A protein has these predicted regions:
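Auxiliary Fe-S-binding modules of radical SAM enzymes
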Residues: 55, 63, 73-76, 80-211
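Radical SAM/AdoMet-radical enzyme domain recognition
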Residues: 1-71
Length: 211
């Protein structure tokens, strides 16, 4: 189970999410642990917002058998209003307190995260740096939005409407072929690094996209 948690403070949680559900998120994490469900906590470090909680979030992987992953903010929707941290910046900060961390070479799933292990911790610390550490050449992700559009890349607004196909009573073979054709058209790479010059084609919020 992946759970988004950028802060351990109720007030900051409410300010970032617009929802007063901090306690429910914590209860969900604890319920996963009690049930033996493998849990990954995804956090985004934002300058001037929650960076002072970096080590507190890391400590969750010591207290519980969870992986804590730091995701570089993407300039989509509200994300364009914030400044984030790169993997390099966070590793430098982490090394100041935990100089003996160990890189984990084996895969932990089929996602893009790179992991390190801190001695004495139950879980690992992961980093997903989509902007400064492009991994487009190994990306195996597509997304289905709430309104039925299959997105091939977060950066681009384009996609195919599976909802229209389903509502037109298209056959399974037709839908399958449409999926295959779409995947073959998946862009080679995103262009988030051009955001400052050209803007981002995707105009929807991450909550609307499904991420």
């Amino acid at each position: 189970v992946n759970i988004s948690l950028d802060t351990l403070k109720k007030e900051t949680f409410h300010a970032l999410t617009g929802r007063p559900y901090f306690s429910q998120v914590i209860e969900g994490i604890l319920a996963c642990q009690a049930s033996g469900i493998r849990t990954k906590i995804n956090s985004v470090m934002l300058k001037g917002t929650n960076e002072e909680e970096f080590f507190d979030l890391i400590a969750l992987a010591k207290e519980y058998p969870v992986d804590v992953r730091f995701i570089e903010i993407m300039p989509i929707g509200y994300g364009q209003q914030f400044q984030g941290y790169s993997k390099k910046e966070l590793l430098t900060l982490l090394e100041s307190r935990y100089p003996n961390f160990v890189s984990v070479s084996k895969s932990r799933g089929n996602g893009p995260a790179n992991y390190i292990y801190l001695p004495g911790f139950q879980g690992c610390i992961g980093f997903i740096d989509a902007i400064h550490g492009k991994f487009c050449n190994s990306c195996n992700r597509i997304r289905l939005t709430a309104d039925g559009v299959l997105k091939l890349c977060l950066y681009y607004e384009s996609g195919i409407s599976l909802k229209q196909l389903l509502r037109s009573n298209a056959s399974d073979d037709t839908i399958l072929q449409a999926l295959k054709d779409a995947v073959l058209k998946k862009p080679i790479e995103h262009q988030f690094h051009l955001k400052a010059l050209e803007g981002t084609p995707e105009i929807r919020q991450m909550s609307q996209i499904g991420g």
